[in-house]
Amino acid sequence: MLNGQIAHSYLENSCTLIIPRPPVLNQSSKSAQPAAAAAASSSAGEEFGQEAGSGLAEAEALHVDRIRNCDIFVDAHDLYFYADVKLYKFHSRRTFDLRELKTLLIKFNTTENHYQICLRCLPLTAGAQEGPGGERGGGGGTGDAAKQWNSRKEYIAAFLHLPTLSANLPDKQPLVQEWKLKRITDQCQLQLDDHERTYKLTNNFGYGYASEYSGPLDLSELDRATCRVSEPHRMSPIQRRQERVVDEMKRFSREQYKINFVELQVPSGHQNPLRYKPKIYETSMTQEQAHLLHNISRMQTREQQPCDVFRQNEIDCGLISILLAICYDVRTTNNEPTCESGWTRSILCPLYCYFEQFDNYRDVLVAFLRRMITYPLYRNFELGRQCVRDAIEVLKGGRNWLINQLLLTHQQFASSDPSRDSFNNYYLEDYIRYVTSPSACSDEHMRLLARNLKNVLMDVNKQHLGLGVTEIETELIKELMQEMRIDAGSQGSSPQQQHGDDDLDLDNDTSGQEDETTTDDESVITDSFYSVDMDMRLIENEIVYEDDEEDEDDDEDGDDDEDGDGDEDEDEDEDEDDSSSSTTTSSEAEGNSVIEQCSNSETAASTT
């Protein structure tokens, strides 16, 4: 997809754009259905010839289909105009007034061979005189100053007859979100010169290898599950890119990316893809692949002609896109193709899925990295960069390895279910012929591609992907840090809690010992008082027994007195008094010893 520049001018609240028609390429295109394409071209020529004069009709009949073959996208500050084979981009410092845009008239000047579009702009205000993302005309100043500087550049360009001078001056390119652009092709009308009749824009764009193919696809060979564009000839390359970007944004999974961000989730028994070392200098071709290569080379009906620099750039970008998908599959399968290899090599390549055209290496890398973190099993940004490094090594000196892998991919597409033969027909076979031709793709040219790709890799970062990867990683890091704080807090509190539990156990053990000691002392005291009680009871019983004996003795004394024996009674009384006093003295001594023992026990208990 070629890029062109637009000359513009502001007049009050309107912006006039001058878009040159792209030159006719010398390279002929292949038509999937030549009869249908010829009929469409002849009908367009007849319609144009009815309105224009005979001389003008003869001059423009062959190119009227190319004049009408346009696709237009517009936003508040941006306009994308795809004319036949070339994309023109314009960023306005003024805001376009799209509220009442129902029909946009496009004038084509057959003499000067350019399109002219006039768009209304919103009035300038004090606070909104510059468009977002920078000013194409001035850079950094106020809106009036930027307008004066832009007018000065336009005056110089008009004086020197260089309408693209203002666009070629160094300015900061604004960041445009292409998926937000609105397609207004159906609202546009084309007017040739000053004729009153207007025409609708048509859609008949090229696709495939170097955009050489046109017409409808053979749907029987199309894998609808992988290929998202079934009518590439009806969609311009910018529309195909927009479809791809929107699909990737819908299918991108934040959680899946988080899972593979810190460490790849490699199944057990498989090698980590980041540790794989491809052997690009050790390759061999099977007999079946050699036979396939021979047949593909014989299918070439005409010699490879040197194409212009724009087509060459598109071919090289397509080759790099195919190679990146192959490198990912080889690295993730350890160069042992699986049943999913055909799907992997097709889903990671926008050429197969959307028939997309690339004109610079940066877009190729960004598209591959976006799809790599969206669709396959391993979705890791660093893994994608490693695949790019593998592709660089292949371009440096792995031509045989590349041819072998292209043939293997051809076999996988042909034998897959559903069939992916359309990818072989429109891309792979032409690229196999291109790589195997030393005149079309020399070793020096491949080394130049490797150097350019290496330089671009250093400039591409995660912000270029446009999927919020940096924000997702920051969010994940915060979550991991929060979990680490929680784990550290739980681990820090558990030893303290364990130490506290040990102290509590020690206290419980000490209190238990104290309880046991107290219980022993209490038992000693209780036993002492129990023994004292028993002794007192014994003393009382002895006293009772003595009283009974005294009563009996009194009775006997009475009998003796009756007999007149008084001396013996006195002697017995003295003996009883002596025995009772001795008994009382011994009992008191025993009681005192028990009390002393109790007091000693209490003293010992209080001391402990």
Swiss-Prot record:
Cite the GO molecular-function annotations of the record. unfolded protein binding
Q: Which GO terms describe its cellular component?
A: cytoplasm; nucleoplasm
User: Per its UniProt entry, which superkingdom is the organism in?
Assistant: Eukaryota
Where do transmembrane segments lie in this chain? none
Q: Where is the composition biased (Low complexity)?
A: 489-498
> Which residues fall in a compositionally biased region of kind Polar residues?
588-608
Q: Quote the InterPro entries the UniProt record gives.
A: Shq1, Shq1_C
Bias (Acidic residues): 502-524, 543-579
According to the record, the residues making up region (Disordered) are 487-531, 543-608
Q: Per the UniProt entry, what are the Gene Ontology biological process annotations, in alphabetical order?
A: box H/ACA snoRNP assembly; protein-RNA complex assembly
**Task performed by this protein:** Required for the quantitative accumulation of H/ACA ribonucleoproteins (RNPs).
Family, as annotated:
Belongs to the SHQ1 family.
User: What protein name is recorded for this chain?
Assistant: Protein SHQ1 homolog
Per the UniProt record, the source organism is: Drosophila melanogaster
Lineage per the UniProt record: Eukaryota, Metazoa, Ecdysozoa, Arthropoda, Hexapoda
